[in-house]
UniProtKB/Swiss-Prot annotation:
<feature type="signal peptide">
    <location>
        <begin position="1"/>
        <end position="17"/>
    </location>
</feature>
<keyword id="KW-1168">Fusion of virus membrane with host membrane</keyword>
<dbReference type="Pfam" id="PF00509">
    <property type="entry name" value="Hemagglutinin"/>
</dbReference>
<keyword id="KW-0946">Virion</keyword>
<keyword id="KW-0732">Signal</keyword>
<protein>
    <recommendedName>
        <fullName>Hemagglutinin</fullName>
    </recommendedName>
</protein>
<keyword id="KW-1165">Clathrin-mediated endocytosis of virus by host</keyword>
<keyword id="KW-0348">Hemagglutinin</keyword>
<dbReference type="GO" id="GO:0020002">
    <property type="term" value="C:host cell plasma membrane"/>
</dbReference>
<comment type="similarity">
    <text>Belongs to the influenza viruses hemagglutinin family.</text>
</comment>
<dbReference type="GO" id="GO:0046761">
    <property type="term" value="P:viral budding from plasma membrane"/>
</dbReference>
<keyword id="KW-0945">Host-virus interaction</keyword>
<feature type="glycosylation site" description="N-linked (GlcNAc...) asparagine; by host">
    <location>
        <position position="27"/>
    </location>
</feature>
<feature type="glycosylation site" description="N-linked (GlcNAc...) asparagine; by host">
    <location>
        <position position="40"/>
    </location>
</feature>
<dbReference type="GO" id="GO:0019031">
    <property type="term" value="C:viral envelope"/>
</dbReference>
<dbReference type="GO" id="GO:0075512">
    <property type="term" value="P:clathrin-dependent endocytosis of virus by host cell"/>
</dbReference>
<dbReference type="InterPro" id="IPR008980">
    <property type="entry name" value="Capsid_hemagglutn"/>
</dbReference>
Amino acid sequence: MKVKLLVLLCTFTATYADTICIGYHANNSTDTVDTVLEKNVTVTHSVNLLEDSHNGKLCLLKGIAPLQLGNCSVAGWILGNPECELLISKESWSYIVEKPNPENGTCYPGHFADYEELREQLSSVSSFERFEIFPKESSWPNHTVTGVSASCSHNGKSSFYKNLLWLTGKNGLYPNLSKSYANNKEKEVLVLWGVHHPPNIGNQRALYHTENAYVSVVSSHYSRKFTPEIAKRPKVRDQEGRINYYWTLLEPGDTIIFEANGNLIAPRYAFALSRGFGSGIINSNAPMDECDAKCQTPQGAINSSLPFQNVHPVTIGECPKYVRSAKLRMVTGLRNIPSIQSRGLFGAIAGFIEGGWTGMVDGWYGYHHQNEQGSGYAADQKSTQNAINGITNKVNSVIEKMNTQFTAVGKEFNKLERRMENLNKKVDDGFIDVWTYNAELLVLLENERTLDFHDSNVKNLYEKVKSQLKNNAKEIGNGCFEFYHKCNDECMESVKNGTYDYPKYSEESKLSREKIDGVKLESMGVYQILAIYSTVASSLVLLVSLGAISFWMCSNGSLQCRICI
């Protein structure tokens, strides 16, 4: 009976002791992140660094509308194809939209020299001033300026480019011409012209009254002399002749001089360019909408302040960096492992080793206490706030460093530059791969550091409590301490805020420890006596059983016993 009372006393003492546990917050979040060592770690809080959505529309860029070329190409627009007449009045834009394979380009067949370079130049232009460089009515009094072609028809009538003049002979003559323009616009001026290549000598004589024509174009940075190539060619757009198109950029203060005795397609309008580094040319079939955005891709607009996107590598405006990643999520909270709460008489709760606490909602780290006055959770606001500040600063720093928003337009190559285009693609792919690797590695490393940081903070909080309590309490696992003395709410609060008075409770704790140690010793002595008696009794039972079996076997002759003296 005495043994039973001692065991019950020991159990009662352990069950009803005051306790305090250190743990961390948990919630119902299903966010997962990757670290250097683990994949799909469930965490309480995280931030997404990768934008993967767009609106599927073409939008204004910071309130400025794009220039939609419609069914016209850049060549058709800048030369003044009659079918692109509606674009003539457009002089400013946020970016240029060209459809894939537009119908209206160069209406009169021929080669457009350095066309891809011209597109590249225009991709950085946000506005221009279209002005008459050589007025039609006064610049060419000795030449006919009404040359048209059925291949450039408009509304069923033969026409020609709005920005060029096809000069032909007048009154049976084509006098030598010399015309110059001095750039006084204080901007670069884009000048375009052409050279006509007739299909036969008869056509050459009829138009220009000479067989040995030339065209010369000279400026400080450009000098070239063209000779018409008279030859029969396959018909294109019902034309056997060709017009080759040329352009140059005239610096402020520079002069361009045109000399010719035939075959000149003269400039009528030129363009004073204003550069805008946020502009660009994109190929897209996306519809225009009444929306405003900071970033435009061929697939649609992106409205995001995130540092990375995987929507499209070609972007216009202030855009996140393109990476090939499918997921870039940075942890800001803790590992989310809600504990399985085992409830005894006083609802004992597992601590931070086995899992977090969903009941603690006002902080990341904190305490759960239990005494005669009840139980409850309390966050450690100081350590939580320090952690929040540190992680917030880190996330902001990462986003700020990686969030270099910019325009990334595609490079232009002609059909004869396939090797260069392929090399450029390989280089671009290499850069994208490097950016993707750097972004993913950065997130993996920072996630690992953040989770280790949280683990360290919980451990530091545990050590803080342990150093205060010393031998006034014992560690019982799961981040918990069991007091050797009564600890009311005021006492619990002193442990949490670091003002626990160790000497005040040391005597009570000492007596409690001695009492518990005495109970353990007496209980151990009783158990030893019981063990001895149990061993002796079992041995006697075994001997009696063996004797009875031997006697029975001897009596029925199964066992013979001989005693020799």
